[in-house]
Each structure stands twice: as structure tokens, then as C-alpha cells.
A protein has these predicted regions:
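Double-stranded beta-helix
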Residues: 133-135, 162-192
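A short beta-loop-beta micro-motif enriched in histidine and acidic residues
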Residues: 91, 103-116, 143-145
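Single conserved hydrophobic/aromatic residue that forms the stacking wall/gate
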Residues: 1-11
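Short beta-strand His + acidic residue motifs that chelate non-heme Fe in jelly-roll/DSBH
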Residues: 82, 106-108, 126-128, 149-151, ...
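Terminal hydrophobic/aromatic helix or amphipathic segment near a protein terminus
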Residues: 26-65
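Short acidic-glycine-tyrosine-enriched beta hairpin
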Residues: 130-155
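Glycine- and acidic-residue-biased ligand/ion/polar-headgroup-sensing regions
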Residues: 112-131
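A short glycine-rich, His/Asp/Glu-containing loop-to-beta-strand
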Residues: 68, 72-107
Length: 192
């Protein structure tokens, strides 16, 4: 057992094996930074007072300059785009959605997946309806007032760009990384 001091915060007692495993984990994460539009980076779980947190900062300080910038895969269609920004190991993903003027996106619901929509630019309407009911919840949102709207499990939902001229830019958090083998996404229009 070794004593590791994370000055000035804490002293941890770790086995050499744990320290080596943590070093390899951080090194793998740095090597996993994409060279091109391969998709989002994966964020490691890192308590801020832990060894992994400090090691990752050290590894990143040696990241080659050309790897400090990398493309993300934009999924583009006539409605706009959807880009996954960051995946986490056990806390989901963060994405950015751009909707063209007048466009409605979504019209689906999830059993256990939940999302948060945060409009950062533009003017939109988020609608939700609990499956099996007729009541539609309407949330008017704008980049002028940053708010978070939770897409509740069991509620079909959409987001509508109300502008005729501006794109609607929405940051989206989802509690799980998308898995095409188990998408937990079911089509149903909010307004029947």
C-alpha cells in the first residue's frame, strides 16, 4: 500500500495495482480522443478530489496540440442537425440539436429514458402529452431566458421552431447513451 498525497486536499492509501490501473485508464481516455468525425468523446467518472482527476489533467497537459481540436459527427438533414457532444460512462450523453425555421422534431416517447432540453438560441415550443391522455403541456422557450424542460418518461414530446427566420439551437441531456439495439424510442404525435 502506498500513500498518495493530493496536495493540499487529501491523502489516500492505494495499492500499486490501483494506481497503475488508474494511470492506464487515463492514458486510454487520452488516446481515445478522436482524430476526425468519429463521434463524441467519452468523459471518465472523476471525483474532483481523486487521483484520476489529477492524472487526467496531467495527461491532457501533454495532449498533442493537433488533438486539442477534433470534428464531431453532425447528423444533418433538411430539418437541421443533431450532434452528440459528450458521452459519459454511466450518466448519459449531451447533444446539440439545431432545428430550421418552422420545423418540428421529436414526436416520440420513452419508457425509462428521460431528457432535458435547454434552448440556447432562437424561439421554440416544447410540447408533451402523457401516453393515453389528451392533455398537451406547452412550454414556450427562448434563448433569451435559459430554462431546462424535462422530457418525462411516458410522455410523447416534440420541439417546434416558432421562428420564420432563425435556427433553434437546443442543448439536450439524456440520462443514457443512445443504444441502437435498445433505443427505447416510440413514435407518437403529441397532437392527434
Amino acid at each position: 500500500t502506498l500513500e498518495v498525497t493530493l496536495f493540499p486536499y487529501t491523502t489516500l492509501f492505494r495499492s500499486l495495482g490501483e494506481i497503475v490501473d488508474t494511470i492506464y485508464e487515463c492514458a486510454r481516455a487520452v488516446r481515445a480522443v478522436p482524430d476526425s468525425a468519429e463521434g463524441p468523446s467519452t468523459a471518465l467518472e472523476m471525483p474532483q478530489d481523486g487521483l484520476r482527476y489529477r492524472l487526467m489533467s496531467t495527461f491532457l497537459s501533454y495532449l498533442p496540440k493537433e488533438k486539442a481540436i477534433f470534428d464531431l459527427k453532425m447528423n444533418v438533414d433538411p430539418r437541421g442537425s443533431f450532434t452528440e457532444l459528450v458521452h459519459t460512462l454511466n450518466c448519459g450523453q449531451v447533444s446539440i440539436n439545431i432545428s430550421k425555421p418552422g420545423i418540428t422534431k421529436g414526436e416520440h416517447w420513452h419508457n425509462s429514458k428521460w431528457e432535458q432540453f435547454i434552448v440556447v438560441s432562437g424561439h421554440g415550443l416544447i410540447q408533451m402529452r402523457k401516453e393515453g391522455t389528451d392533455e398537451v403541456l406547452n412550454y414556450e422557450v427562448s434563448g433569451d431566458k435559459i430554462q431546462s424542460v424535462i422530457m418525462l418518461p411516458g410522455y410523447t414530446h416534440n420541439i417546434i421552431n416558432l421562428s420564420e427566420t432563425e435556427d433553434l439551437v437546443t442543448v439536450m441531456y439524456c440520462n443514457e447513451v443512445f443504444n441502437p439495439e435498445r433505443p427505447d424510442t416510440y413514435f407518437d404525435k403529441v397532437e392527434k
